[in-house]
Every structure is written in structure tokens, then in C-alpha cells.
């Protein structure tokens, strides 16, 4: 008789790294990682995703919407996730804004971070009768309203003295909390400045003016810049020689804010009432279809593997986990080379 011993074997192209034995050849593996390719951004599956703050506000930037430009008034949909599609928000129409003096560029991004956002139905203060008045409310030909008349931002009132065009010591107005559902109140305010001749004509004082806002433990001070600004046109409107500085303050439920001002103040009017949290991620529009995950570098991803390699960046949703190198799960046995046949005895 012949007695032969041996083991089954097969070629093994699979190598896995183990914690105890280093690289090991195995008979089978399951890949656990994928390398995504860049795609368009999408709506996040199972939740509401917000692109533009106001999808129905045509030809409006998010800053237009946040400031209440007359032709950019509309409903902001609730959303659990938001796309930050204007990394550095562009300017708003109506009036040239000195963006670099305040955090106003952050206002649209602040609003994006809330799930529910609504504009109050009435004004937070009576601007015409504010301290230092009576005032008439200034408008801009570059800011037409729905009736094609001159208008201004819904969140602010440009307080121009009616007849007491004289210099004034700092005046104080209290800004009450008027939101009704325990939301954060975002109150927008600012001030106007121009050349000396215009300041004297509008306000009776051509000197730099002082302004202070205070709310929720945060106090901010400003001094207006008086000078000959070059004419600037916003969104094809009329050339403007003046500039406005716009800021905002966040008031917590029941908390009163204060604004101390001199001439040229833009008093708060309608305020934003915001609640809940919305996850924000940098991306681009339009949103096409749905995806399991939104990734800053790759756009919309559908999760096919538990891990991914490639560019590491912020992601929201049901996302694979980033790893530096590909991972494999061994689903076979350790490879053994073919056994040599024993010689006949």
C-alpha cells in the first residue's frame, strides 16, 4: 500500500497586517475601505438640508436675506443640516457696508447654525420716537421695496433727525427681548457715516460719532469714520458716497440689550428668533439627490464601506470613518504552501 499525506492549498495574493505576526498571507479578505471620488453635494438622507437661507428669494445673497433687504424677504425653511456655500459672504445691496470693521459677514453663518429661524412680525423698538428724536426713517434709491419705492433693510431703521439737527451726547436705548418661544434673539443694528458736508447736513454734526452695544455679557465699541469715501454702487443701484457699519448682538431669552449712540445710528427693527441646532458644513450648491453623508472635500457620499482613505475633512451624516491606510478583514485561513509528497516506502 501507499500512504500519502498532504494539505489543501491555493495561491494567496492576499496579505494582511496583524498585531502579533506582522504581514500574513491569507486565503481570503474582505476590503473595509473605499477611496471616494468628488461629487456634487446632496440632501442628507432622513433629514432636511438647507442650501440657501431663503430658497425662494431670487437674486439674493444670504447676507441680503439676513439683513432683510426688501426684495429678499421670505421664509427660511427649518433644517437639521445646512450647507455653508458662501465661505466669505458677498456684499449685500441697498447700501455699501464696511464689512471689515465688524463681524457682520458671520451673520448668515450664525443663522445657518439654527434649525428654526424666523423674522419677528413687529419691530423691537419705535425708531421714530427713540431718544434724540423725533426721527424720520432714511431710505435708499438702491434699495427698492415691493412697490418700487425707496426702502431700507427690514432689520434696521436709519434714524435721521427731523428738526433737531444738532450734536448730541451719547444716548441710550434699551432693546427688549420680543421672541415668543424661548428662542435666541439676533438683533441687527449699525450706524451711517459720510463726508463732513453730508454729516453736517443730515445730522448737524460732522465729528466722529461713538456707538456701543451690549448684550449677553458682550460689549462692543465703535467710532465712526468721517471722510471722503469714493462713490460705490451696490448691485447696479445708485452711487453712494456714504458707508454703513452693521453689527448684531445675540440676546438670550428674557434678556434686554442696550445700544448707546450718537448721530447716524441704524436702530434695530425686526429681529431674528432662532432655536434648535443645525449641523453646518462647507459645500456648494445646488443640492442634487440624496446621500448618506456630506463631506467637505468629496460632496455627497453613499456609505458602501465602514472606512475610507483619501482626504480627511469634516463630514456629517452616516459617514464612513477616515483611516490613513486601507483596512482588510481576513475571512479565510492562514495560507500554507503545498506540502511535498512523501517518498514511497
Swiss-Prot record:
Glycosylation site residues: 25, 59, 145, 164, 231, 302, 331
Function noted in UniProt: Binds to sialic acid-containing receptors on the cell surface, bringing about the attachment of the virus particle to the cell. Plays a major role in the determination of host range restriction and virulence. Class I viral fusion protein. Responsible for penetration of the virus into the cell cytoplasm by mediating the fusion of the membrane of the endocytosed virus particle with the endosomal membrane. Low pH in endosomes induce an irreversible conformational change in HA2, releasing the fusion hydrophobic peptide. Several trimers are required to form a competent fusion pore.
Gene field: HA
Protein name per Swiss-Prot or TrEMBL: Hemagglutinin
Organism for this UniProt entry: Influenza B virus (strain B/Yamagata/16/1988)
UniProt-listed GO biological process terms: fusion of virus membrane with host endosome membrane; fusion of virus membrane with host plasma membrane; symbiont entry into host cell; virion attachment to host cell
Subcellular location: Virion membrane; Host apical cell membrane
MF terms (GO), sorted A to Z: host cell surface receptor binding
Record's miscellaneous remark: Major glycoprotein, comprises over 80% of the envelope proteins present in virus particle.
Key words, A-Z: Disulfide bond, Fusion of virus membrane with host endosomal membrane, Fusion of virus membrane with host membrane, Glycoprotein, Hemagglutinin, Host cell membrane, Host membrane, Host-virus interaction, Lipoprotein, Membrane, Palmitate, Transmembrane, Viral attachment to host cell, Viral envelope protein, Viral penetration into host cytoplasm, Virion, Virus entry into host cell
Family: Belongs to the influenza viruses hemagglutinin family.
Coiled-coil residue spans: none
Disulfide bonds: none
Keyword Electron transport: no
UniProt cross-references to InterPro entries, sorted A to Z: Capsid_hemagglutn, Hemagglutn_HA1_a/b_dom_sf, Hemagglutn_influenz_A/B
SUBUNIT field: Homotrimer of disulfide-linked HA1-HA2.
Chief location: virion
Gene Ontology cellular component annotations, sorted alphabetically: host cell plasma membrane; membrane; viral envelope; virion membrane
Membrane topology term: Single-pass type I membrane protein
Gene3D superfamilies: 3.90.209.20, Hemagglutinin Chain A, Domain 2 (2.10.77.10)
Entry comment on modification after translation: In natural infection, inactive HA is matured into HA1 and HA2 outside the cell by one or more trypsin-like, arginine-specific endoprotease secreted by the bronchial epithelial cells. One identified protease that may be involved in this process is secreted in lungs by club cells.
